[in-house]
Amino acid sequence: MPRFDSIHEIRTPEKSLSPVEVLRAIKFGIASEFEAIQVYQQIMESTDNLQVKTILTDITNDEMHHAGALLKLLDILSPGDTAEYLHGMRKALFQLGMGPNPNGNSQ
């Protein structure tokens, strides 16, 4: 399997990726998009240069769109993952007093 832990390791595979490998690659892509967003936001917060802020704001928005597209692709290919993420969101709302217990009990 090709490695997706570094951009330098990504290469054309000799064979098609397995479904598990595709999911792993998509999850790596999602993480990479969020990492890029964080880097660009840190640069914007560290400069007064309006040209830099303008361009990086646009790039950051693009990265958010990419992350959203990859998340939707993950949802399509692995609905079980989506169910777990949604459960985590409902659990957080419950812990914050903003929603019912996702486990259906009173504790």
Name each model-derived stretch.
Residues 1-107:
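Iron-associated oxidoreductase/ferritin-like identity signal
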